[in-house]
Amino acid sequence: MGKTIVIKCGGSVLSDLSPSFFTSLQEMYAQGMNIVLVHGGGPEIGQMLKRLNVPSEFVNGLRKTTKEVLEVAEMVLAGKVNKQLVALLRQHGLPAVGVSGVDACLLQAAPIDLAKLGYVGEVVNVNADFVHQLLKSRYIPIISPIGADKDGQKYNINADTAAGAVAKAIKAAQLLFVTDVPGILRNGSIVEQATIDVIERMMNEGIITGGMIPKVKAAIAALSESLHEVMIVSGKTPFYENGQLHGTTIRNEVGVY
């Protein structure tokens, strides 16, 4: 099989994905790459909770997930957002399969802190064989981050950490975090590569601010012995052209600033 790329699309960028995003996917697929998409859906979940008058709150940046909130989260993530993405890829001639982390025990989860966060989970195991079977058949798995434990209890999982867990488990060559900007910007120019210490310095100096902070933190957290680099890319402009990825590469090794 060809090189495997995991792409994480946050809920906030899903509605802004441009035709060039899908053109990049088409080019990667045509070149024999294996593509896995992991998506979020925070804004959509928030809107649905409000519409259904289901109370919710955030604790340390994570949505406290009661049984009622979990039902809505699963409905939105697995039922709505996932299938919208499958349909979008189909429109662009790409064979996608939408799955939840519950399917085939894809994302086995355990509670992070049941008392404080409710049914918010962390990934303790990934069914890599299932993903590889889909990739071998040249499907593009689109994964919604709802997992379950061995007893079938479901959990809402942060999409960033789910994407990192999947990338590590299937030994992906690259993990891309899709944002609304073409990468980390410094004085209006893209920082093409940086190391963890450089990223931390840029945060301290106020070069990386706002919504980019959790994105780079998630990217850093995904780095491991098997995953040496991750990228911040744009969903609004081509992120892959002529065999080249465009964005900011974050790696463990020595980079530039």
Curated annotation (Swiss-Prot):
- SUPFAM superfamilies, alphabetically? Carbamate kinase-like
Q: Which Gene3D superfamilies match?
A: Acetylglutamate kinase-like
What is the reaction catalyzed? N-acetyl-L-glutamate + ATP = N-acetyl-L-glutamyl 5-phosphate + ADP
Q: What class of enzyme is it?
A: transferase
Annotated substrate binding lies at 41-42, 63, 156
Kindly tell me the pathway this chain contributes to: Amino-acid biosynthesis; L-arginine biosynthesis; N(2)-acetyl-L-ornithine from L-glutamate: step 2/4
Q: What is this protein called?
A: Acetylglutamate kinase
Q: Record the organism.
A: Geobacillus sp. (strain WCH70)
For this protein's source organism, the top of the classification is:
Bacteria, Bacillati, Bacillota, Bacilli, Bacillales
Protein's gene: argB
